[in-house]
Amino acid sequence: MHEQIKKVASCLYSVKTVIAAVLMLFVVGTGTAFAQQSSRTITGKVLDENNQPMPGVTIIIDGTTKGTMTGPDGTFVLEQVPAGSTVIVSCIGYTNQVLPEGKSDYQIKLVPDSEMLEETVVVAFGQQKKISVTGAISTVASADLRKTTSTRLDNALAGRVTGLTSMQSGGGQPGVDGATMYLRGAATTNGKSPLILVDGVERDNIRTVDMNEVESISVLKDASATALYGVQGANGVILIQTRKGQKGKAQLSISFDQSWTSFTKEPDRLHSWEYCELRNEALSNDGLDAQFSEEIIAKYKNPLLGLDPTSPDYDNQVTMRKAVYCDNDFYRMYLKKNTPQSRANVNISGGTDFVNYFVNVGYIHQGGNLNTESPDYLGYNPQCYMDRLSLRSNLDFHITKSLTASLNIASYAENVNMPAVGALYGGNPAADGNQQWMITDLIYQSQTILPISPGPTTSSEFGVESGHIIDYNYLDRSAFEIINRRGFHTNKRKNLNTQFSLNWDLSELVTKGLSITGMAAYDTYNRGILEGLKQEQTYYATVDYNNDSLSYSLHNSATSPLTMSSWRSSNYQLYVQGSVNYARTFGKHNVTGMVGVQKVLGDDSGRDSLQRYRYGGARHIFI
């Protein structure tokens, strides 16, 4: 009986083994079949509009980086294409095609992209089809520029033009955060920047051009830049075309952008008790005694340690303890974490059979990141900020079938405010560039002044009137004094650009393709500076840990009231340009030619005037 049971069990085990093997083969076979059905291999050949093989065409699975390219004979093989995926065939100058599913072999015929072939770029005195340009030219579309939150066009170009190096200076403060541009490296001829032209007129810079006014930007980077601009174009040319109106109903566009700016990286904070512990550790490593006792470190952690709340002069003791055992974060004391920036824009465009129009009004407010005292307390405002109002009106007139005229008017009014720091850094008080050294000084001092240092102003509990500046004997000047107590610097700029041009098509009068173009532009630039300078006495602070007290000693006794100075300057420029143009197609041949002349007249020296006077309150000051 026992032997029979063993035989039955053995048979059952054999049956289980066979069943398991069959099931495993079924699963593997099903998985293999499923894998075979979930991906496929596709092949094909790509031809152009003339049925010629196209090498170098990209075939890629949409949403992935997996793809291949056609060989010299236009054929391709793409393996492991997931079921249900989209395969795209693309080539520069041709319209993209999507391969339909359900096939494994394709014959693809690409169609030229007519829009790309007709795309034009601005070149010197006119426009040219992009496909026919042989020089090194980069273009930037207006839609790309309007995506940025930058308030300056020169900063917005950074990273959007190949070979363009943009180096920002001025400390990054509002109104003085300009960028110096170089094409193909900073080692340009005499270290000069590219020549800048807006609608064909030479400009000193493009920082005030509203990005909502720009239609396109072309950057000439090789010999094509010197063909018509000579040595001025040796470092490249940046050509900016502003927007024009199109025939049709009026289109109104309103936009508002609110953003906040901040430093990309900020230093970590060191607390006062952490400094004391690290200082003791450093002295211990040198075999020296500790500078701060455990009691002092404990009081830095809790300034109210050991005080009796029932004491009659408890409030006074609290004030004194907090002044002695301070934990100052000078970086945050001098600099804000976030700064607001606002931008509003309104434009309208349209046209009729006689005139096309584009009108744009823009406003920008850029706040500063300095933590300054209240203007009501100081009597003036040393904060960094910029306000700019800009206007552009482009009108195009169709006088006759062959004669057109354009009138472009652009203007801006800008107000830039900042602390009066020019004289502190050995520069011209009227110069804005010294702001760069101010920011460098602030960041340096915020990391140099110890968190246990009292300040930034005196306290009346220790024998000196409150509110006086505290200096530190290991620094040349106090950062608090720089941004608050030295005065203010206001720069007001106004600019007006007027441009009139005519274009006469002589195709019917003389010969087909011949035209004459003339243009005159008159620019005026006015600048007014109002600066208030003052000086206050400063003190040193000494901490007495034995008595939990502070003492002040006079450092600089020199004082002077707020002294006002103003500068005014103005200059103008007259720009005249004319050209004869010829463009005609003979069969498959395009013939173009141009003869041009230009003249620039102006007064670059301007008119400067200086006035000095003293003012008691220095409140609500306008130029």
Give, region by region, the residue ranges found by the protein language model.
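Surface-exposed loop/turn segments flanking beta-strands in extracellular/periplasmic regions
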Residues: 275-288, 295, 299-326, 426-478, ...
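Extended, hydrophobic alpha-helical segments in both membrane/secreted and soluble proteins
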Residues: 197, 214, 391, 518, ...
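Short, small/polar-rich motifs associated with maturation and membrane association
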Residues: 2-392, 405-406, 472, 607
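Flexible loop and strand-edge segments within Gram-negative outer membrane beta-barrel domains
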Residues: 263-266, 322-362, 366-370, 382-476, ...
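Residues on the lipid-exposed face of transmembrane beta-strands in outer-membrane beta-barrel proteins
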Residues: 185, 242, 346-352, 393-397, ...
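Conserved short loop/turn motifs at secondary-structure junctions
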Residues: 141-145, 409-413, 520
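Small-side-chain secondary-structure face that scaffolds active or pore-lining regions
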Residues: 364-388, 418-420, 425, 487, ...
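Secondary-structure transition into beta-strands, especially the periplasmic turns and strand N-termini
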Residues: 164, 245-252, 348-357, 397-407, ...
